[in-house]
Curated annotation (Swiss-Prot):
SMART domains for the chain: Ribosomal_S4 (SM01390), S4 (SM00363)
Annotated family: Belongs to the universal ribosomal protein uS4 family.
Origin superkingdom: Eukaryota
Protein name per UniProt: U3 small nucleolar ribonucleoprotein protein IMP3
Any one of the GO CC terms: nucleoplasm
Organism: Homo sapiens (Human)
Bilayer-spanning residue ranges: none
SUPFAM superfamilies: Alpha-L RNA-binding motif
Length: 184
C-alpha cells in the first residue's frame, strides 16, 4: 500500500514524466569531464566548451580561405602560436590540429592538473586542495583559484610557497632543508 501524496508532492510530480524521459549524451560526457578533472563549477566547463568551439570555427574559416592569401598565412600562424603557447596543441604544425582542441584540452592546462603532471601531488583531489589552501605559487604570485590556466612558459615556475609546510617536508625528505632560509 502506498500512502496518498500530499498536495505539493502531486504538483511536483506533474512536471516529471517517468515514462518518456530522455538521456542526453552530451550531459553524460559533461559529467564525466567534470568528475575527471574535478571541476567545481559547471560554468568553467561551458566556458571551455565555448572557447574550443570558437577555436574550431576560426580554424575552419581560415581553412576556407585560399592558401596563398596573406591574411590566412598571418592569422593561422598567430592562432597556432597562441594555442601552442597556451599548451592546447602539441606543435605549431597546421590548422588541422585546431580540430582536436576540446574542453578537455583546457582542463589539462588547469593548475591542479599541471601539479599532478609535475608530480607535486599524488591525486587530483589533493592538488585542488593544495591550490585552494594557498600552498602553490606560479612565478611570484600565490594562486588560490583551481581554474587558473598555466601556459607552457609559466609551467616551469610552478612551485611551493616559501612558507608552506609541504615545501618544508619535501626539503626535509630530500635532506636539502636550510634552517636559515625557512625561519625567515
Amino acid at each position: 500500500m502506498v500512502r496518498k501524496l500530499k498536495f505539493h508532492e502531486q504538483k511536483l510530480l506533474k512536471q516529471v514524466d517517468f515514462l518518456n524521459w530522455e538521456v542526453t549524451d552530451h550531459n553524460l560526457h559533461e559529467l564525466r569531464v567534470l568528475r575527471r578533472y574535478r571541476l567545481q563549477r559547471r560554468e568553467d566547463y561551458t566556458r571551455y566548451n565555448q572557447l574550443s568551439r570558437a577555436v574550431r570555427e576560426l580554424a575552419r574559416r581560415l581553412r576556407d580561405l585560399p592558401e596563398r592569401d596573406q591574411f590566412r598565412v598571418r592569422a593561422s600562424a598567430a592562432l597556432l602560436d597562441k594555442l601552442y603557447a597556451l599548451g592546447l596543441v602539441p606543435t605549431r604544425g597546421s590548422l588541422e590540429l585546431c580540430d582536436f582542441v576540446t574542453a578537455s584540452s583546457f582542463c589539462r592546462r588547469r593548475l591542479p592538473t599541471v601539479l599532478l603532471k609535475l608530480r607535486m601531488a599524488q591525486h587530483l583531489q589533493a592538488a585542488v586542495a593544495f591550490v585552494e589552501q594557498g600552498h602553490v605559487r606560479v612565478g611570484p604570485d600565490v594562486v588560490t583559484d583551481p581554474a587558473f590556466l598555466v601556459t607552457r612558459s609559466m609551467e616551469d615556475f610552478v612551485t611551493w610557497v616559501d612558507s608552506s609546510k609541504i615545501k618544508r617536508h619535501v626539503l626535509e625528505y630530500n635532506e636539502e632543508r636550510d634552517d636559515f632560509d625557512l625561519e625567515a
